[in-house]
């Protein structure tokens, strides 16, 4: 086995739930401030997933005080405590950049019906 691939497999996290673009997720980040450590939750919709080995990322968008906030998270980051999938969304695209131009109720994502 290639040495680089072996090291990448050791660095990958196996506790990541399956989610896709359009899903509503809560990302629990570990924040270190001086000697203290706390958990900060970022709750929003996944608008983009870039798959790969250890360099996989996903982008989460939320509206905070009327301003759109997007944050890019490395999938296998040691600072991510856990990822919760709150609701699955029904979308037809993998990159939801069009949500940036929508406001209010138009920017909502329909929930996925599971029967």
From Swiss-Prot:
Presence of keyword Ribosomal protein: yes
A Pfam family matched in the record: Ribosomal_L19
Gene Ontology BP, a term: translation
Gene Ontology molecular function, alphabetical: structural constituent of ribosome
Cellular component GO terms, alphabetical: cytosolic large ribosomal subunit
Superkingdom classification of source: Bacteria
Function of the protein: This protein is located at the 30S-50S ribosomal subunit interface and may play a role in the structure and function of the aminoacyl-tRNA binding site.
Similarity-based family: Belongs to the bacterial ribosomal protein bL19 family.
Protein name per UniProt: Large ribosomal subunit protein bL19
Organism: Oleidesulfovibrio alaskensis (strain ATCC BAA-1058 / DSM 17464 / G20)
């Amino acid at each position: 086995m290639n040495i680089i691939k072996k090291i990448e497999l050791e660095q990958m996290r196996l506790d990541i739930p399956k989610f896709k673009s359009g899903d509503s997720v809560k990302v629990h980040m570990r924040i270190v401030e001086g000697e203290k450590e706390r958990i900060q939750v970022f709750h929003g919709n996944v608008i983009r997933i870039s798959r790969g080995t250890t360099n996989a990322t996903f982008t989460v968008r939320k509206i905070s005080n009327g301003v759109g906030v997007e944050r890019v998270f490395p999938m296998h980051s040691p600072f991510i405590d856990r990822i919760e999938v709150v609701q699955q969304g029904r979308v037809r695209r993998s990159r939801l950049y069009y949500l940036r131009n929508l406001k209010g109720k138009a920017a909502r994502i329909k929930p996925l019906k599971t029967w």
